[in-house]
Structures are given as C-alpha cells and as structure tokens.
Regions:
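Glycine/Thr-rich phosphate-binding loops that ligate phosphate moieties of nucleotide
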Residues: 1-33, 67, 71-104, 138, ...
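Gly/Ser/Thr-rich active-site cleft segment
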Residues: 11-13, 112-223, 319
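Short beta-strand-to-turn element immediately C-terminal to the catalytic PLP-Schiff-base lysine
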Residues: 21, 75-78, 132-134, 155-158, ...
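N-terminal phosphate-binding loop and adjacent alpha-helix
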Residues: 29-61
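Signature tryptophan residues that serve as conserved aromatic anchors
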Residues: 47-48, 90, 112, 131, ...
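Phosphate/pyrophosphate-binding loops at sites that engage ATP/ADP/AMP, CoA/4′-phosphopantetheine
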Residues: 51-64, 135-140, 186-196, 364-376
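Active-site nucleophile and cofactor-binding loops and adjacent substrate-binding regions
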Residues: 64-69, 88-91, 116-124, 143-149, ...
Length: 461
C-alpha cells in the first residue's frame, strides 16, 4: 500500500526546516532547509520566500502540511492584508517599558495572571503592539489586524484567500488570549493598541484550515515550543528543556497555570492541554560566544569544559548577553564572578559558561515544580543538547534523570505529526515513536546552583 505523506515546517529565527514523513509511522522520507537573516525584526516576505524555496520539489506526493514557527512575533497588516512594517520578533526587547506600563494599566501582575495565565514581558506580542502604537503612530494608523509568524505562513499557503487562522497554543503567547477560557481577551488587545484589531480565528487542534493551490491540506499549525512537544511525544508531566537560540523549560499539563511572578507563562499546548513554560533569551549562543573568546571550536570548547570540575573553580557566569527574559532583566548584560589568579583558566571559563546557561534553566524547571509539575525526567533538545559538556553538566543541575533524545528537527516533526493527525480525522494523535533516547542518571550538585543564586542576588538583588 502506498504511503501517505505529510510535511512539517519549523520557521525559526535563524532558519526554515522542512521534513516529509510517513503519516502513519513518522518515518523520515526527505527534508530541506533554508536560512533567515539574524536580527530582532524582519520582513515576513523573507520567511515566505525561504519557505517556498525549501518546499520546491518537496511536496509532489504530500497530502497535508503543518507549520510550526517562532512564537510572539508581531505581524501587522492593513485592511488589504498587506504587511505594514517588519515583524518584531520575540527577541526584540525594545518593548520592555511597554510591558511595565501594561502591567500597571491592568492593575498589576495578579490581574494579568488571572486574565491570560501570564504576566507580559518584552517578548510578548501585546507589549510590541503597545510599543508600536506609541512609537510609530503614523504606521500604526494603517493597521487593522495582527498575526503571528505561523499564522502568516499558513495563510500565505492558502494563497492569501482564506481568513487567517491560528491555534490556541501559539495564541496563548500573545498576551491577549486566555488558555483556560480558550478565547481572546479583546479588552486587553484594545488596552495595548487603543482600538480593536482583527485577529486570526482559533482552529481546533486537529483541524484542516484550508488547502494550498495544489490541493494539499493545511493543518492548524502552532508555536515552536508546542510543536516540539508534539514531535517528542511529550505527555502530561513530561518536562522538556530546549537549548536553541533561546532556552525554554516546559511541561505538558492537564491543568492551566497562573503564575503572578511572571516566571512561568501559562501557555496552551497543541493538543487541547496546557504547556506552562519559562524562557531564557540566552542559550546556545552563550556557548558560541564563550568559544569565540577562547578561540576554539565547539568541540574543543566542550573538552575544555569537561576538564574542569563542578563549580568551575569558583567562576560563576551570569550569561545575560542579550538582556534576559527570565529573570525579567531586558537591559542586563553578562557578568563573571569569583575571578582569582588561580581559577582564571580556559577550562574553568568554558565550564562556567555551560553552567551559567543551564543554571537559568534549572531555576526554570524548579519554578515548574513549584506550580505542581512532578517531573520523572528532563529531556534535553535543541542544537546545544548534542554538546557532550552540556549533557554531562546537566546531570549535576537537575535532580532527576536527563534524557537525550536523538538529534532531530522536533519542531518540524511536531508540525508534521499535527498534519498527520488532521489528515487522519481520528480523535487520537498518530503514535510516532522517538527511539534511541539515552538516559543519564543525576549527579546533583546543589552547590553550583547556590553559587549562581548568590552571584545573582549580589548584582540584581
């Protein structure tokens, strides 16, 4: 019997990746990729052009496609659905003051947590809308609607004919959608932009939302973290730490979360459940930056880090190289503590960089635990998860076993799995197996986290 094929897309900050998989088994058939320019804002047309290049010749026998994409990006359009300005991305922190203002305008953090499950940060779409309205009022007057990156690409694949759609997972990262109530908070959208805006319709998790001009069915799509959870096959209680451009720690949950501290965002997942999540702006690029300082490649950097002992000889790096989201320090810079003549070695500096990256995410996992998540293991994914030093040092910072799934494009895989689900018209997701996962037992060293916490308090209170 002929295989039924589906495609999944990961449109991220730096690249686009496409996989084609067997709809029933998840077996990889073929793949492609393209690149995006680095930065904090981008013309969405670049995403579209790179996507169409990557899809060229790839979809001849594909029956359905799903789009996973970076969360939070602000794509604003006029009444003819023309893009009005370059999209502001999740890593653009110029809306930090707008976030503070919005928190006050709604009466404080508790009110935000009750209304949307999250307290807005500079990454959230709602804060970008406020910044845009205040700083570019002439352009803002032209705007009638707002979309997210995956909404825009899915809509473009329909030939820009259908009404834009989104899913509750990606919508929950905007700051104007309630995952627990499953609806937009239009009063918050108006609070941010001073007038009403059109927003994409919320599609069911396994819906078909349209077709391409070739007749390929389009799944609802979702945000990158939600898609990665799908690609991994994460279930309730599973904790995932993703180490890409940013770092995220999240768990699939049966219950919504409401964290007024703002550390954990109360997101939805892509299946009808919830995905409480904490995000750091700084992850894999910390390692690249540290390796550049040492004038070594990442392989040699990993060897240097492993040659040092837990605690890096007393060196502690707070790696806020691009500001930080968790903790909420958008204007912070990196800081190195504990330097002496004896401990300033390449080995200790390399290990301090890895420990600094992972300590922030260990704190994020602990925040999930405080909200009721009971992890049995932590799965490491993303580009930096393949680094041997990252894998080994992670066992010293998490209290539970560390799972290392095989290297894969889990966001694109999750989008493909969603497409297979929509194509099947079944109530249950297709059972795609993730094999060859390595499980590392914990070697927990609380003193490393304690030193990190002490350094943080000394500088940031």
């Amino acid at each position: 019997m002929k295989k039924r094929l589906v495609a999944g897309v990961d449109s991220s900050t730096q690249s686009v990746k496409v996989v084609v998989r067997d709809a029933e088994t998840g077996e990889l058939v073929r793949e492609a990729r393209g690149s995006h320019p680095d930065g904090t804002e981008i013309d969405p047309q670049i995403w579209w052009e790179e996507l169409t290049k990557s899809l060229s010749g790839l979809l001849d026998d594909v029956e359905a496609i799903g789009i996973g994409a970076q969360q939070h990006g602000m794509v604003v359009v006029d009444e003819d659905k023309n893009v009005v300005r370059p999209a502001l991305l999740w890593n653009d922190t110029r809306s930090a003051k707008a976030a503070e203002d919005l928190i006050q305008d709604l009466g404080g953090r508790e009110n935000w947590a009750k209304a949307t499950g999250s307290v807005p940060l500079a990454a959230f779409t709602v804060t970008k809308l406020r910044w845009f309205a205040e700083n570019e009022p002439a352009l803002a007057k032209k705007v009638t609607g707002v979309m997210l990156p995956h909404d825009y690409l899915t809509w473009k694949l329909t030939g820009a004919k259908a009404n834009p759609t989104t899913d509750r997972g990606d919508a929950s990262g905007t700051g104007y959608f309630s995952a627990s109530e499953n609806k937009y908070k239009n009063e918050i959208l108006k609070l941010a932009f001073s007038r009403d805006l059109s927003v994409p319709d919320i599609a069911e998790p396994n819906a078909i939302v349209g077709e391409t001009k070739e007749g390929i069915k389009l799944a609802a799509g979702t945000g990158d973290n939600m898609a990665a959870a799908l690609g991994l096959g994460a279930e309730s209680g599973d904790v995932v730490v993703s180490l890409g451009t940013s770092g995220t720690a999240y768990a699939v949950s049966d219950n919504p979360s409401f964290d007024e501290s703002g550390i954990v965002a109360g997101f939805a997942d892509a299946t009808g459940k919830y995905l409480p999540l904490a995000c750091t702006l700084n992850a894999a690029r910390i390692l690249s930056a540290a390796a550049k300082v040492l004038k070594v490649d990442l392989d040699e950097f990993s060897k240097l880090a492993l040659a040092s002992k837990p605690g890096a000889g007393g060196l502690v790096l707070l790696p806020y190289l691009d500001g930080e989201r968790t903790p909420n320090l958008p204007n912070a810079t990196g800081s190195l503590f504990g330097m002496t003549r004896e401990n300033m070695t390449a080995e200790n500096f390399a290990r301090a960089a890895v420990e600094g990256m992972l300590c922030g995410l260990a704190d994020a996992v602990n925040a999930l635990v405080e909200l009721g998540v009971n992890p049995k293991k932590v799965s490491l994914i993303g580009g930096a998860a393949a680094n041997p030093a990252v894998q080994k040092i992670a066992t010293t910072l998490f209290k539970v076993p560390v799972a290392i799934p095989p290297v894969a494009e889990y966001v694109a895989d999750g989008a493909a799995r969603q497409a297979a689900w929509a194509l099947s018209k079944e109530a249950a997701l297709p059972n795609w197996k993730v094999s060859d996962t390595v499980l590392l037992e914990p070697d927990y060293r609380p003193e490393v986290l304690e030193a990190y916490s002490t350094s943080f308090k000394a500088l940031h209170g």
